[in-house]
Regions:
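Feature activates predominantly on carbohydrate-active enzymes
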Residues: 35-253, 270-271, 372, 406, ...
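Catalytic-core regions of glycoside hydrolase
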Residues: 101, 121, 144, 156-167, ...
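C-terminal non-catalytic alpha-helical accessory regions
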Residues: 83, 129, 183, 414-663, ...
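A generic structural signal for ordered alpha-helices
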Residues: 44-50, 109-112, 116, 187-198, ...
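Hydrophobic transmembrane alpha-helix bundles
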Residues: 32-45, 113-137, 182-195, 264-275, ...
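Short, Lys/Arg-enriched charge-dense amphipathic segments
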Residues: 15-36, 103-114, 153-154, 169-179, ...
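Mature N-terminal, pre-catalytic/accessory segment of carbohydrate-active enzymes
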Residues: 1-152, 282, 299, 551-701
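Generic detector of short, locally flexible boundary/turn motifs and exposed helical patches
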Residues: 18-24, 62-65, 110-113, 192-194, ...
Length: 701
């Protein structure tokens, strides 16, 4: 970027995009130089001379200069340019990313393809208009990493000289309806019946596909965004059966094919910054020459080494996930990797909207060095429908992340849906909104605060005021924050670690892999999130009946917090609704808040009913049972209100790949069944100490 100067009568904006330009500009204006020369840093300086005011952006690099320019553009838009003060800015978190499961093609699926969102977004993945808007939104919110996840993307990305028939022309989608019977490890994501009925979404030879992704990466590079592909292993969709390639771990032909494909990926995409790999979820835990880590090194590591022999100056980052492997085996197998080698940890497992300080990384921290730092996978498998927004929670979550000597960065996103265009609205825009655009406030909070957690709430308030001038911004912001407290409150109380075990929008888990709808008995017997300081119902009952101190937040306190947030949301909404006028986005945003408030009231009443039943289980007193029934009847009414509010804005039924079909109004009979469960409850059926449940293990030594 060259130095840019914009005049506006008695006002001038000047932007410098490297240290030399910044020093020269600071000297010319007689202002202090930029303090940080680190990547993405910038300073804003205000100078006045001879009646002319100059706002200068001193960038340490092009990205820093862009961020400074965005600050000035924002100040112009919000009407605060005259008060924009001189200040220095550097990122708190160096790399701030999005995790995006990419449904490339029915023949090269992502981990999320057996769901409505993935199927509807296949064509969008091959639209440059989509990626231009998506990446531009990322940059505005200060994200600088785009991680693209797919089980086996190579046939849709490269043409390998040794395996030319593997490369796939055109983009195809199956005409067979998806369902909830697929494996949760991806090993049957391509089925013969799916391949028997394909339609061509877009005519596109492999050469055009390569040109397309080069253009996407070039646009990302121009916006300061690094791009990475991530894979799971061993999947050979699109290549299976060709040249003797199979998914068998001891098949040397498969290893050779992967090695050549990785080499070509590096060589084909000069702007690709690296690759991320997984030692699963389709690998055997072998201890021979075909062990997980030896296989990965021979397939991926040697492929990268081969590419670097041809391009010795090429930098290429390797990110190895902890998932389904051990630290010792990883570090031993990859000790000779010739470039940056980092790890990746599922930070809050599947639920970022839980507590601001997830404890799961603590056992791993001592083994993480500054030479091999970890990335955080920050999974959002809590909220698929609604517009979330609570700066207090986001700021606390970010501040609790490990320091830079341990953490390379993070990428956030879901496995259970796809952050492409939304396809659930009952009154969609044309074309349909990108999820990142629909949920702009949430993405703004996480992106801007991860760059600078000291940003004041006043910035977000001014932004809301500009976007929704019909309503008082402080009131709108408070209602949004209160509604957004529902998801963390309930998820820390009723914990299901991985995505298929807990989807709080629907009180649901996968119907076969877990329990389906969680009943009031499940709540009585449920566990709370480790490290949350919240007591489960059985822990609370034990303390209450023994007369010992409550060593934590009680279930009734959780219920009260949910009720309080929901009541405050609905109180504020009454006035906001009266002012919404014809602003469609405002109306829909308030509708999301209303839905979240009714959901919070539902969970509060259900927890109270579960507490009553836990006492009845010990006392046998009918008064406890009747109190439970009353609370569960209230829960039913709140669910009905939730269903009405939800279906005003969203299709009532969607298929998600991790929990199956979610039908909010269709679940009313299941909610009613809780009342019947209470009526027929037999005392003495809940032990004081419950069996330990299966738990995800994100770290192994």
């Amino acid at each position: 970027m060259d130095r840019v100067v914009l005049d506006r009568s008695a006002f001038k904006i000047a932007i410098a995009s490297d240290p030399a330009q910044s020093t020269a500009l600071a000297t010319a204006l007689g202002v202090a130089p930029i303090k940080s020369d680190g990547p993405q840093s910038y300073a804003i300086r205000r100078a006045t001379a001879n009646g002319m005011t100059t706002l200068a952006v001193l960038g340490s690099d092009a990205t820093g200069a862009m961020y400074g320019g965005l600050d000035i553009a924002e100040a112009i838009r919000l009407g605060s340019l005259d008060t924009l003060a001189s200040a220095d800015h550097a990122p708190r978190i160096e790399r701030r990313g999005i995790k995006f499961n990419v449904p490339l093609d029915a023949r090269t699926p992502s981990y999320s393809d057996n769901g409505d969102a993935a199927q509807n977004n296949i064509a969008e993945m091959w639209s440059f208009d989509f990626w231009r808007e998506f990446i531009d939104e990322m940059a505005r919110h200060r994200y600088n990493v785009l991680s693209l996840w797919n089980l086996h993307p190579f046939p849709s990305l490269v043409k390998v000289p040794e395996y030319p028939e593997v490369a796939l022309d055109d983009v195809k989608r199956t005409l067979v309806p998806m369902d909830d019977t697929f494996s949760h490890s991806g090993n049957d994501m391509v089925r013969p019946d799916l391949l028997a009925k394909l339609e061509t979404v877009k005519k596109m030879p492999i050469a055009d596909k390569i040109a397309f992704w080069r253009d996407v990466m070039r646009h990302a590079h121009n916006r300061g965004v690094e791009v990475y592909w991530f894979t799971w292993n061993i999947f050979t969709w699109g290549a299976e059966g060709k040249y003797g390639i199979t998914s068998q771990q001891d098949n040397q032909k498969t290893i050779d094919y992967f090695r050549a494909s990785v080499r070509e990926l590096v060589l084909t995409y000069p702007l690709l910054d690296g690759i991320g790999i997984t030692a699963g979820e389709h690998m055997e835990d072998r201890k021979d020459q075909f062990s997980k880590e030896k296989w990965l090194w021979n397939a991926y590591g040697r492929g990268i080494v081969d590419a670097r022999k041809l391009e010795p100056d090429r930098r290429f980052r390797m990110i190895h996930r902890y998932h389904q492997s051990s630290t010792e085996e990883i570090m031993d197998a990859w000790k000779d990797y010739p470039d940056t080698f980092e790890l990746s940890f599922k930070y809050a497992i599947a639920h970022m909207y839980s507590i601001p300080n997830p404890p799961f990384i603590q056992p791993a921290l001592p083994s993480i060095s500054k030479d091999h730092r970890t990335w955080l996978t920050v999974r959002d498998d809590d909220i698929y429908s609604f517009r979330w927004g609570n700066p207090e929670f986001a700021r606390a979550f970010i501040r609790n992340m490990p320091d830079r000597d341990k953490m390379a960065g993070f990428y956030m996103g879901p496995d259970g849906t796809v952050w492409g265009r939304e396809f659930i609205s009952t009154e969609p825009e044309r074309p349909r909104d990108l999820v990142i655009s629909k949920r702009w406030y949430s993405f703004m909070l996480w992106g801007r605060l991860s760059y600078d957690p000291e940003l004041p709430d006043s910035l977000f308030e001014r932004t809301i005021a500009k976007r929704f001038p019909e309503v008082p911004a402080p009131q709108m912001m408070r209602a949004w924050a209160e509604a957004s407290k529902v998801f963390p409150q309930i998820t820390r109380f009723f914990w299901g670690d991985i995505d298929l075990r807990w989807f709080p929008e629907a009180c649901l888990s996968h119907p076969r892999a877990a329990k389906g709808f969680y009943t009031v008995r499940d709540f009585v017997e449920g566990a709370t999130m480790p490290g949350s300081g919240v007591l489960s119902i059985t822990e609370w009952r034990r303390s209450k009946l023994s007369g010992t101190a409550m060593n934590g937040v009680t279930p009734l306190e959780v219920a009260e917090a949910l009720s309080k947030s929901s009541a405050e949301t609905l109180r504020l909404l009454a006035d906001l609704r009266a002012r919404q006028a014809a602003n469609k986005e405002l109306r829909l945003t308030l509708g999301d808040m209303e839905s979240m408030a009714y959901l919070g009231n539902y969970y509060a009443a259900k927890i109270r009913g579960a507490v009553d039943l836990a006492l009845f289980d010990k006392s046998g007193q009918d008064a406890d049972r009747q109190s439970a029934i009353k609370n569960l009847q209230a829960a039913l009414e709140y669910w009905k209100r939730y269903a009405r509010a939800y279906t005003v804005q969203y299709k009532p039924s969607q298929l998600y790949n991790r929990v199956g079909v979610v039908d909010i109004p269709g679940m009313i009979p299941k909610v009613e069944e809780d009342i019947a469960i209470a009526r027929r409850w037999t005392p003495g059926t809940v032990p004081d100490t419950l069996k330990e449940r299966p738990a995800d293990k994100p770290f192994q030594k």
